[in-house]
Structure formats: C-alpha cells, structure tokens
C-alpha cells in the first residue's frame, strides 16, 4: 500500500507487525519526496525491534527514514487534538513558505502519514476525564479537521490518515461484507448509530473513506 493509494481517512484492521514495517519502509524510502510518518499511539505498539531488523539504523541509506519518523504517545482526545493542530501548522507553514519561495520551504513535496493506534483508548480516557458528549465532540472535530486537511492538499504538501483498529471491533463490517449487503449511499452513512456499535464501526460508517485489508 503506497501513499498515493490512501484515501483521506483509511481504517487498517489488525495489521501484522511485518506488514506495518513494510508499509513504513516502502513509503519513507522514496526519492524526490519527503514522506514523514507521525505515529500516534496509546498502547506503545510501534514495532521498533522488527523495524530495525528490516531497516538497519546503522546503514547510511536508512538515516533519512529514521529522521522522518515521529512517535508520540497520546492518551486522550485532547492530546490528539493538540497534535492535529501542530500538523495543520506544519502543512500551512510549508505551503506559505513554498508560495514565498523562502529557504524554510521543503524543496521536495511533503507527504505526511498520520498513523493512529489506540483511538478507542483515547476515547475511553476522555470519557472518564470529561463526559461522553465532550468526547464525541472532540472525536468529531478531530476527524473532520483531518478530512479538511487532507482535502486541502497541493503539490507542496498533503496528509493522509490511517486508523488502526482490532478486527474484532469491526464485526458489523465483516458481517455485511460476507453477506454483500453494505450500501454506500449517503443516507445509510448518516443514519443513526445502533446501540452497541464499537468506536471502529462508528468511524467506519460516518468518517472513513475506505478499509484496507
């Protein structure tokens, strides 16, 4: 899966550590483009040892890959919202600098991959800290902001978001897939959520553009 194949918001159910490492290497090793990975995690899941075996950090050709990886621990939606604002600032400043032709602008196109794992943990922690209503507001605002940022791409900078969820949290998706009953109509995407939907199913129905398997 390459950057160009990603939708604005993509769900990736239970990727293996090997597939995740291959994805990172494939996208961050390209020439003539700066691809940065922002790995936002609530569960300390970045497969560092596997990645170092696949991409030895001591080799000169791999230095650039490691320089373009940012790993952040994020425990609630307030922290995720703050990170989203920082990414928006990065994209905006790069766009402004490119228009002005300043030395601060990235000379090669900037592509940002925002990889979020543990969103259900962040959501649950936010519910404990504030309220269910506030948590839903933060989730909605963050996801909508990511969509706006993705749509506002240009030749100098763009962003794509990947959300990792356990497969077992997407039982409704797999049931509908097996029965060939899912509809993509706008009306069905906007229908009221059934009681018992997991966070992953909620995001799949209302915010995600695709699900990668």
Swiss-Prot record:
Entry's localization field: Cytoplasm; Nucleus
InterPro entries noted in UniProt: Csm2, P-loop_NTPase
Keyword check for Nucleotide-binding: no
One biological process term in Gene Ontology: maintenance of rDNA
CDD domains: Csm2
Domain of life: Eukaryota
Keywords linked to the UniProt accession: Cytoplasm, DNA damage, DNA repair, Meiosis, Nucleus
GO cellular component, one term: Shu complex
Keyword Nucleotide-binding: no
Family according to the record: Belongs to the CSM2 family.
Subunit structure: Component of the SHU complex composed of at least CSM2, PSY3, SHU1 and SHU2.
Described function: Involved in chromosome segregation during meiosis. Promotes efficient recombinational repair and functions in the protection of the genome from spontaneous and induced DNA damage like mutations and gross chromosomal rearrangements (GCRs).
Further remark: Present with 414 molecules/cell in log phase SD medium.
Protein name: Chromosome segregation in meiosis protein 2
Organism encoding this protein: Saccharomyces cerevisiae (strain ATCC 204508 / S288c) (Baker's yeast)
Underlying gene: CSM2
